[in-house]
């Protein structure tokens, strides 16, 4: 899960195939795999296209990027503006084609989206709070000078579309608590509005409390801990419940046991 603290720009999941076809038209001549996908837009061709773009080297890569950058002169709006942005930092990276394949998502502060396993994503601009489930791997897919294991990456990616309008998490408000539904059991995430009145926060698991804005005072017996924006506290399972008060908002990560 990624929760935006500032305006946040990211890419997440493959676009609808029909949308990819439309966006690839201006760069159809950049690589044979693009033409193949345009002729037969399905998961298999998308897999081949994804791998082919990442595997480009030398003259083949230079030519493809030149065609892409030439298209920027005549194309406006998204995702072309995002390509312009990342080209300032990674001008020779094959990942510049990624916004044509992946959803470009703009989160406003307070909005969140879930990042599914085996689904490409990238954080491009802004500050956010990220919560990760236990994972034993991270596979790079571009926009980095580091090594990319392309065969392993392709073997672990699901080449299926996820509509952009379904990526944002729809929170449910319960009093002063805003609960963000998570489609896995690994963790839970909620946001709490604070006031001068003490509120009890309780869970059966350990928890992390993060001050999003304002100030928060945590109380447990005679002990008090004040959090300012950007500060967090770990609450052991045997320390629950605690009371909180203050002004602003507090994010909570825990397990629903």
Residue ranges and their predicted role:
Residues 1-11, 126-145, 187, 247-257:
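A short hydrophobic beta-strand segment most commonly corresponding to one strand
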Residues 1-12, 16-18, 76, 80-84, ...:
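Glycine- and acidic-residue-biased ligand/ion/polar-headgroup-sensing regions
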Residues 23-89:
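Long, charge-rich alpha-helical interaction segments
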Residues 79-80, 87-119:
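Positively charged, Gly/Ser-enriched RNA/tRNA-binding surfaces
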Residues 104-114, 119-123, 129, 220-239:
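Short acidic-glycine-tyrosine-enriched beta hairpin
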Residues 127-179:
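C-terminal, non-catalytic macromolecule-binding modules
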Residues 173-176, 185-203:
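Conserved short histidine dyad/triad with adjacent acidic residue
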Residues 213-257:
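Generic C-terminus detector
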